[in-house]
Amino acid sequence: MKKIAIVAKVHDPRCQGVAEELIQWLEERGLTPLVESHLARHLRCGEGLERADIPNLADLVVVLGGDGTLISVARLVGDRQVPILGVNLGSLGFLTEITLDELYPALESCLSGDYRLSERMMLRVELVRDGQAIKSHQVLNDMVINKGALARIIDLETAVNGNHLTTFKADGLIISTPTGSTGYSLAANGPIVHPDLDCLVITPICPHTLTNRPIVVSSDALITIRLQSQN
């Protein structure tokens, strides 16, 4: 590993300070720090590197912040096989497991090849209208359908692999990966799922029917959700 990208929560002064120290640490070891453009402007260290270019150039991405910052980076590099080292400087640290005290020892291990990759599954989501896919996204944590601010309960007809599962009458529906099970799904009374498991969690948001509970399905399942009505 020679080129190390640095992405941080730019408006957090603590993250900026750690980033400056990290840049110096890398340069002292003859490594090339690739500073994300927004962070570079805050640190006044040149133009930096656009996020879209990080997957093509970096051997490792160091993320300084919380889970939200790491998830935004995962969307970029998830299908490029670029490892991410998450350092917890935020309020949530389910994904950013490395503490600040562990940052440099962890980096030394990565540079020497003494590390273990934790692979996480991602979820591909398509929005279909009139039989045409109009949007497609790949996400690390979850996909959420919710009602508008002034709307009432919505009916969500749900099928798995073409077989009718149920119609959720609720404020919305969450489809989460094991990684996303500790986020919005957990707040909606969904289960915590170990990240090594190959499954997806279907969690209704404030269901109107008590029997509408979270359901766990296989990771290779095709989940189809049709909005029946919106009042």
Stretch-by-stretch model annotation:
Residues 1-60, 101-116, 127-137:
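ATP/NTP phosphate-donor binding region
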Residues 6, 63, 175:
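Redox-cofactor binding/interface segments in oxidoreductases and associated redox assembly factors
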Residues 11, 67-69, 92, 179-181:
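Short glycine-rich anion-binding loops that position phosphate/pyrophosphate groups of nucleotides
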Residues 15, 68-74, 182-187:
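Short glycine/serine/threonine-rich phosphate/pyrophosphate-binding segments
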Residues 72, 77-87, 94:
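Gly/Ser-rich helix-loop-strand patches that form or flank binding pockets
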Residues 92-171:
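Catalytic core of DAGKc-family lipid kinases
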Residues 145, 161-164, 210-231:
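ATP/nucleoside-binding phosphotransfer catalytic cores, i.e., glycine-rich phosphate-binding loops
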Residues 166-211:
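Gly/Ser/Thr-rich active-site loops/lids in small-molecule metabolic enzymes
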